[in-house]
């Protein structure tokens, strides 16, 4: 299922939300309508938590996470950290990191198994990332852009890349991530994919300007038409067994 939403008339909803398979963070402030869209789709399966990071509402660009953990920049306050620890499932590890590239969501893209990171990301951050999120880490660019977290979105089912990504890069990234990838846009032609949408294994949210053509590409590559939460555990088990055999 792919749903359209906006945050205070802003269609860059990927800036104001962070969605994974075990939790969803939504920025404080904004209209109730924005939360109700997320809560309507998610509240029966995962917690939808109001949060800020370092006093900012652009939480989607500030943090990076998956079902195993959440990484936030060092300027996240103790109160914000405690609130997230209290609100998220106990299985989710939350870690503050000292990183020069502090908008972690712009420089890291990940699913539950693999992370793509900015070529200049600190080595220590890379190690923490691999440990906290339990992912394999690759330094990459997308369409020659270093902000890998901004120019793609991917789940354990598929991924959407910057429209100028070459076929060779698509094939390389697809083999690293082990999921099908396509190039595309959101919000009627925006190349900044991750700012315009958030996605997990059964649900996607896109900016209100996203066209029906863009939505159908998203529903197709992320396999959302036949996905619902109860099938996720089964498919996760299958993929885990595949990776072990």
From Swiss-Prot:
GO terms for molecular function: ribosomal large subunit binding; translation initiation factor activity. Keywords: Cytoplasm, Initiation factor, Nucleus, Protein biosynthesis, Ribosome biogenesis. GO terms for biological process: assembly of large subunit precursor of preribosome; cytosolic ribosome assembly; maturation of 5.8S rRNA; maturation of LSU-rRNA; ribosomal subunit export from nucleus. One of its GO terms (cellular component) is nucleus. Binds to the 60S ribosomal subunit and prevents its association with the 40S ribosomal subunit to form the 80S initiation complex in the cytoplasm. May also be involved in ribosome biogenesis. Monomer. Associates with the 60S ribosomal subunit. This is Eukaryotic translation initiation factor 6. It comes from Xenopus laevis. The lineage of its organism: Eukaryota, Metazoa, Chordata, Craniata, Vertebrata. The gene is eif6.
């Amino acid at each position: 299922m792919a749903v359209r939403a906006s945050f205070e008339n802003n269609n860059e909803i990927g800036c104001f939300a962070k969605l994974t398979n075990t939790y969803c963070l939504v920025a404080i402030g904004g209209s109730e309508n924005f939360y109700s869209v997320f809560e309507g789709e998610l509240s029966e399966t995962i917690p939808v938590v109001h949060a800020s990071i370092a006093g900012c509402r652009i939480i989607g660009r500030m943090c990076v996470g998956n079902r195993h953990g959440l990484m936030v920049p060092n300027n996240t306050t103790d109160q914000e950290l405690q609130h997230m620890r209290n609100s998220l499932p106990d299985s989710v590890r939350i870690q503050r990191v000292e990183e020069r590239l502090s908008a972690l969501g712009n420089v890291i893209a990940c699913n539950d198994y693999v992370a793509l990171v900015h070529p200049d990301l600190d080595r220590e951050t890379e190690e923490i990332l691999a440990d906290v999120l339990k992912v394999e880490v690759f330094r990459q660019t997308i369409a020659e852009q270093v902000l890998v977290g901004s120019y793609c979105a991917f789940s354990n089912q598929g991924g959407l890349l910057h429209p100028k990504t070459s076929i060779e890069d698509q094939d390389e990234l697809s083999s690293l991530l082990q999921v099908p990838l396509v190039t595309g846009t959101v919000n009627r032609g925006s190349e900044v994919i991750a700012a315009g949408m958030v996605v997990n294994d059964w649900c996607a949210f896109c900016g209100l300007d996203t066209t029906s053509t863009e939505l159908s590409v998203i529903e197709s590559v992320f396999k959302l038409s036949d996905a619902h939460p109860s099938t996720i555990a089964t498919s996760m088990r299958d993929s885990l067994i595949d990776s072990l055999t």
